Amino acid sequence: INFIATILKLRRPGLKLMQLPMYCWAMLGTSILVVLSTPVLAGTLILLSFDIVAHTGFFNPSLGGNVIVYQHLFWFYSHPAVYIMVLPAFGLVSEILPIHSRKPLFGYTTMVFSIMGIVVLGLVVWAHHMFTSGTPPWMRLFFTIATAFIAVPTGIKFFNWVATLWGGKISLNAAMLFSCGFIINFVLGGITGVALAQVPFDVHVHDTYFVVAHFHYIVYGGSVFVIFSSIYHWFPKFTGKMLNENLGRFHFIITFIGFNLCFAPQHWLGLNGMPRSCLLYTSPSPRDGLLSR
């Protein structure tokens, strides 16, 4: 609420909304998601606590409750939580790329509207996590379409980032390398996300390592790479001291290669039916998951 109030009401005189840095827009969108989705999770946990401690029947089928209701409430928060983690990274990348490509950010207005589009659509796609939970056909159709549409504002942002780099005087320092690594990883994660939005494919790979790979390409390949990029970009501004660029480039190389060696094979494992969240497997193959290990 403080972020929203500050951005909307406490700007300096003469600073219009469409003149804000992209990171401010990203934090505005993130804050809206937090305000709208987190109370649902809090209420759900309170009801679940009553079920456990006081033996009420909100979600207990033997007492007249419904487990599917719990899933809806849980995912109503937990899918926007992904965007809560990723939207600030979008804002940071939008600040870093223009500096190290020595060009203004391409398509500022469309970047703003794409953030708000992600916020709106991010609140109406939660049930794509529940395609195997007995959801009716009309619900599957709606959430498939809504999930596919969220690729549109996300794609706009990526095209604008590439257009920002195009023709620029790019400095391949550690901050830029990690930002470019983020773009590559997040595009791959986004492609698998569109695939998971399709009901037949999702039913096939649900609860397999394909989902693990998709999640990590979004969260680690997205947010964590941008955290590293931001450290290399702002550390000199915070401290007045430069970090070693050779070590930074080496950090990027081993992180990028190691990350992809770990999680890219998991797509293949999931397509072949390897379930996640299992400690032991009945017929382990020495080849399965060798690189992931």
Outline where the language-model segments fall.
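Structural signature of hydrophobic alpha-helical transmembrane segments
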Residues: 82-83, 143-148
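Generic alpha-helical transmembrane segments
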Residues: 150-152, 220-228
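Hydrophobic alpha-helical transmembrane segments of polytopic
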Residues: 26, 30-33, 87, 114-118, ...
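Juxtamembrane membrane-water interface segments of multi-pass membrane proteins
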Residues: 2-22, 44-61, 65, 70, ...
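Hydrophobic alpha-helical membrane-insertion segments
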Residues: 29-45, 185-186, 252-264
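Transmembrane alpha-helix entry/boundary detector in multi-pass membrane proteins
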Residues: 77, 206-221
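Conserved small/polar residues in nucleotide/adenosyl-binding loops
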Residues: 281-288
